[in-house]
Amino acid sequence: MSALTDLTIAEARDGLRAKRFSARELTDAHLGAIEALNPRLNAYITVTPDQARAQAAAADRVLASGEAGALTGIPVASKDMFCSEGIRTTAGSRILENFVPPYESAVTERMLRDGAVILGKANLDEFAMGSANLTSAYGPVENPWKRHDDDAVLVPGGSSGGSAAAVAAHLALGATGTDTGGSIRQPASYCGIAGIKPTYGRCSRWGIVAYASSLDQAGPFARTVRDNAILLRSMAGHDPRDSTSAMREVPDFEAACQRGVKGLRIGLPREYVADGMSEEIRTLWQNGAAMLRAAGAEVVDVSLPHTKHALASYYIIAPAEASSNLARYDGVRFGHRSSDNRDLNDLYERSRAEGFGAEVKRRIMVGTYVLSAGYYDAYYLKAQKVRALIARDFAEAFRSVDALLTPTAPSAAFAQGETIDDPVAMYLNDVFTVPINLAGLPAMSIPAGLSTTGLPLGLQIIGRAFDEETVFAVSAALEQAAAFTHRPALRADTLNAGA
């Protein structure tokens, strides 16, 4: 479609400031790519061309004044969990199909303040509940990658699959996502891009549709580690409207990408050698460790003994919090309202039955069950105790290492329909990412190799709380060593070639 859609954020920033192209030209190139590819990929639920062009025009005026912000003129996508003032925000659910927020989320507010151009709202699993972007009420998202040996439609990962697919297919230079149990890192791995879940509290949750409040955290997607650093610096910062938002200065994450890893100790958790781990995932992990050694890091084994209990604990805690958070959708105050109701209780029941999809209903039922009087101690309280042990394991490991290296996901992207009928199999996709959310730590996925069928595979770098700088340093070094230059078959810059 245009060479402009092939730029990184850093390149686009430099080009805009050097006046090699305008923000309007950059925005129009991406809107053209969306118009051509989104009908197939379904990466966006809502595209906002008029708003984007107005923001681009404002960016050009700022650029002409010589006072550009960190993201002035940079076109990005916003996951449809972030409230957008005056723009429909659905959370991927029918129950919010006509919800138009009267305010902007704190994260996108910061990005707009820094001059970002928001192209539209990216598709996602309903209420961020899913690992494949198959539960959206607005249809599944197609991964722009293809296997070498067939033309199957692949999942982009979830829940932030639309954000990841949009960035991978060059329909945006970057995107926002949320990560509750792996919803940034796993789609990044499946789509061959980079994405970071910051420390819990690094970014404000104000204005993000809530799933599990003690686990949800906003973060960026981009095609490079450096671009993620640029985005996160804009997104992060204390917000008095969110009581969990940390009162900490936001470091220069972009500068941290240049630090290197010489002298750092990198841990490999023994417990991440999961039963049934494929040989290609094991080899990818070993190769990543070897790359870091070659770059000057010391690589050692560490133990996280309670890791094996993380998935079970997560799928008690997250549904419990979801059951509470989603109780607000009753058909009265906002969202879908059923018609022809007999009484108030019937209104509640019908509105929720019609508005929520099957996976959301499943998690609400599980959450309500574990919070019930007879099972609270047996399930929810026990899961919270295990969560504390998992956090303690990480704290102990970080007494002897600076970062941890693991696979991001147990496999490459799979085809739509392969595991959707087995919710337990779908939940197992989060086995390597969930422990980090339970501990509230920062972690990043970067593309580090290809599967035997030509699909991207990611490695995950985990850091201490509020030490995203080391995560970026290790990720950038690994990115340079891996030299991942493969790109998906379906992307904006191949459209004229008939891809």
Curated annotation (Swiss-Prot):
Broad class of enzyme this protein falls into: ligase
Keywords tagged on the record: ATP-binding, Ligase, Nucleotide-binding, Protein biosynthesis
Catalytic reaction list: L-glutamyl-tRNA(Gln) + L-glutamine + ATP + H2O = L-glutaminyl-tRNA(Gln) + L-glutamate + ADP + phosphate + H(+)
SUPFAM superfamilies in the cross-refs: Amidase signature (AS) enzymes
EC number of the protein: 6.3.5.7
InterPro entries, A to Z: Amidase, Amidase_CS, Amidase_dom, AS_sf, GatA
Keyword ATP-binding belongs to the record: yes
GO biological process: translation
Catalytic residues (positions): 79 (charge relay system), 159 (charge relay system), 183 (acyl-ester intermediate)
Cellular component GO terms, alphabetical: glutamyl-tRNA(Gln) amidotransferase complex
Ligase in keyword set: yes
Molecular function (Gene Ontology), one example: ATP binding
NCBIfam families per record: gatA
Chain's role: Allows the formation of correctly charged Gln-tRNA(Gln) through the transamidation of misacylated Glu-tRNA(Gln) in organisms which lack glutaminyl-tRNA synthetase. The reaction takes place in the presence of glutamine and ATP through an activated gamma-phospho-Glu-tRNA(Gln).
Subunit description: Heterotrimer of A, B and C subunits.
PANTHER family associated with the record: GLUTAMYL-TRNA(GLN) AMIDOTRANSFERASE SUBUNIT A, TRANSAMIDASE
Family indicated by similarity: Belongs to the amidase family. GatA subfamily.
Protein's recorded name: Glutamyl-tRNA(Gln) amidotransferase subunit A
